[in-house]
Amino acid sequence: MKTLLLTLVVVTIVCLDLGYTLTCCNQQSSQPKTTTDCADNSCYKMTWRDHRGTRIERGCGCPQVKPGIKLECCKTNECNN
């Protein structure tokens, strides 16, 4: 009986994937790819143009942006690359 109970607990933990974190890219513009683990359930990629050219910012979450900034939010690992 104890073995069955232990098996059910292990299966439940594996199926629920407790403690899951999303991996988001967080490099800026044309920098080499870097990632970070995020507790948020989404990643973002912001794109805009300034006097230096096209700028890109990546990170965790889905922030509100000003007009003129393109925002893409997504919910899978490294989806904002």
From Swiss-Prot:
Main location: secreted
Classification via SUPFAM superfamilies: Snake toxin-like (SSF57302)
Tissue expression from the record: Expressed by the venom gland.
Name of one Pfam family that matches: Toxin_cobra-type
Annotated localization: Secreted
Key words of the record: Acetylcholine receptor inhibiting toxin, Disulfide bond, Ion channel impairing toxin, Neurotoxin, Postsynaptic neurotoxin, Secreted, Signal, Toxin
Molecular function terms from GO: acetylcholine receptor inhibitor activity; ion channel regulator activity; toxin activity
Signal peptide positions on this chain: 1-21
Matches recorded under InterPro entries: Snake_3FTx (IPR003571), Snake_toxin-like_sf (IPR045860), Snake_toxin_con_site (IPR018354), Toxin_cobra-type (IPR054131)
Superkingdom as given in the UniProt entry: Eukaryota
UniProt keyword Cell membrane, yes or no: no
UniProt keyword Protein biosynthesis, yes or no: no
Listed GO CC annotations: extracellular region
Gene3D superfamilies associated with the record: CD59
Disulfide bonds: C24-C43, C38-C60, C62-C73, C74-C79
Family: Belongs to the three-finger toxin family. Short-chain subfamily. Type I alpha-neurotoxin sub-subfamily.
Function, as annotated: Binds to muscle nicotinic acetylcholine receptor (nAChR) and inhibit acetylcholine from binding to the receptor, thereby impairing neuromuscular transmission.
Entry protein name: Short neurotoxin B
Species: Aipysurus laevis
